[in-house]
Amino acid sequence: MAGAACCFSDEQFREACAELQKPALTGADWQLLVEASGITIYRLLDQPSGLYEYKVFGVLEGCSPALLTDVYMDLDYRKQWDQYVKELYEKESDEQMVAYWEVKYPFPLSNRDYVYTRQRRDLDVDRRKIYVVLAQSISAPQFPEKSGVIRVKQYKQSLAIESDGKKGSRVFMYYFDNPGGQIPSWLINWAAKNGVPNFLKDMVKACQNYHKKT
């Protein structure tokens, strides 16, 4: 994956790998939000925005780390299995690959869209093969804001994946975005407690069907 090397440091990749081995939940007020179906989600209040950062840990059975990472990176395929995607594509901008992503929101809320860059690295850490994908929002004039769609200008995500020692994957995900506008608290709570686990389950199903897509 061609990424914006300038946007992500080696330290950011190392931090994601370290979280996979030992979750960094001390020294801050991380709260356990939900634990179900092998997925555990913690949240931390981001004081400036009043929103939450999230950390997700879990095991996804029946999907190898390499396959899971390939599916996660395949934006064209995601349009087939992610029901919330309205538009998703990637193109070159200022000598780096930039992704555009519009997300469907329930009526009467406006859809949100993201402009972001991402980078994948397949790392060997203490004889462990770890796949890491980092993503963050950027400003790119080639992607002007659309009428009726709210641009998410603060978005950051980390994903680290390794084998669970069987046929599945151990996963760590960090996630934060500021969706802007007035989002009902029930929708924010639903997205955190149900949206993330459901997304991971859908991604496992997508892995199982990945070889059939062509």
From Swiss-Prot:
**UniProt KW keywords:** Acetylation, Cytoplasm, Lipid transport, Lipid-binding, Phosphoprotein, Transport
Tell me the Gene Ontology biological-process terms attached to this UniProt entry: cholesterol metabolic process; negative regulation of cold-induced thermogenesis; phospholipid transport
Residue list for modification N-acetylmethionine: 1
Q: Does the keyword Lipoprotein apply?
A: no
Instruction: Please give the Gene Ontology molecular function terms for this protein.
Output: phosphatidylcholine binding; phosphatidylcholine transporter activity
Found in which tissues?
A: Abundant in liver of pups but levels in liver decrease 10-fold about 2 weeks after birth. In adult, highly expressed in epididymis, testis, kidney and bone-marrow derived mast cells.
- The record places domain START at 1-212
Name the positions where a 1,2-diacyl-sn-glycero-3-phosphocholine binds: 72, 78, 157
InterPro entries hit by this protein: START-like_dom_sf, START_lipid-bd_dom, START_lipid_transfer
Q: Which residues carry this modification: Phosphoserine?
A: 139
Q: Which domain of life is it from?
A: Eukaryota
| Record bears the keyword Transmembrane helix | no
Q: Name one GO cellular component term.
A: cytosol
Q: Which Pfam families match?
A: START
| Subcellular location per the Swiss-Prot or TrEMBL entry | Cytoplasm
Q: What does this protein do?
A: Catalyzes the transfer of phosphatidylcholine between membranes. Binds a single lipid molecule.
Q: What binding partners and quaternary form does the record give?
A: Interacts with ACOT13/THEM2.
Q: What is the official name of this protein in its record?
A: Phosphatidylcholine transfer protein
Instruction: Tell me what organism the protein belongs to.
Output: Mus musculus (Mouse)
